[in-house]
Structures are given as C-alpha cells and as structure tokens.
Amino acid sequence: MPPKTRGAVRKPRKKDKKNIALGQAHIKSTFNNTIVTITDPAGAVIAWASSGEVGFKGSRKSTPFAAQLAAEQAAKRAQEHGVRKVDVFVKGPGSGRETAIRSLTAAGLEVGSIQDVTPSAHNGCRPPKRRRV
C-alpha cells in the first residue's frame, strides 16, 4: 500500500479591511458565557469574541471580568475595520451585561443606543427546576 500523501496546505486567507463607521454590537450574556458580536447595519459579522475565546474556562467564563475582556477584544478587532460608533443590543440574563457595555466605551467605541432584546416566553417551555445545593 503506498504511503498517504497529504493534500495541499491551505494558507489562511487574510480578511479584507471593510471601512464601516457605524455598526451594531450584539452582547449575548448567558449564565455560562458572554459572546460579543459586532456587525455592520445589515447584520454581516465584522468581529466577535467570547469569554471562552479570550482564555477563560469553566465557571470563570460567566464572570463580569471575562465579559469585559471579550468586549475589549471584539472592539479592538472592529476598530481595525473602521468602526467608530455602535448601537448596542443586549440579550440574556447573565452577569456580564453592564461590564461589556462599559468596556466597549472604554475601548474607544462611541455607544449610540442601548436596547434590551432579551426574549421572554409567553408561557412557552417549562423552565428548569430550582437548584438545591
């Protein structure tokens, strides 16, 4: 049997720089993680970061400090594409909501508006039972 040959090694394509002044920052803060996504007004993703991607594992992903670092990293990547002003959409009940918004402004992005888009069930699925520790 002949030795296996590997295919051509693919180089990672460098993303082309978009020049977008106004964007949207979507902060999804759950009980376990915080994900910050910065998009253009149409909804195409420019940059994103999460608490796990920044380097936190396990229960430390749900801390406000992890959300702060994730928001700073997403803002830094978005500023490379020319984003200067964002409208913030916050979703979820997690602990990193406010700190993520604060760190977006601290990173140099101007926050235009803040909207809470947390979905609420109109008597839909049964919620998880209470924890007994």
UniProtKB/Swiss-Prot annotation:
Gene3D superfamilies listed in its UniProt record: Ribosomal protein S11
PROSITE patterns: RIBOSOMAL_S11 (PS00054)
UniProt key word Ribonucleoprotein: yes
Keyword list, A-Z: Ribonucleoprotein, Ribosomal protein, RNA-binding, rRNA-binding
InterPro entries: Ribosomal_uS11, Ribosomal_uS11_bac-type, Ribosomal_uS11_CS, Ribosomal_uS11_sf
Family: Belongs to the universal ribosomal protein uS11 family.
Subunit structure: Part of the 30S ribosomal subunit. Interacts with proteins S7 and S18. Binds to IF-3.
Keyword Iron in record: no
Role according to the record: Located on the platform of the 30S subunit, it bridges several disparate RNA helices of the 16S rRNA. Forms part of the Shine-Dalgarno cleft in the 70S ribosome.
Biased composition (Basic residues): 7-17
Pfam families: Ribosomal_S11 (PF00411)
HAMAP family per UniProt: Ribosomal_uS11
Protein name: Small ribosomal subunit protein uS11
One Gene Ontology term, aspect cellular component: ribonucleoprotein complex
Region entry Disordered, spans: 1-22
Gene that encodes it: rpsK
Biological process terms in GO annotation: translation
One Gene Ontology MF term: structural constituent of ribosome
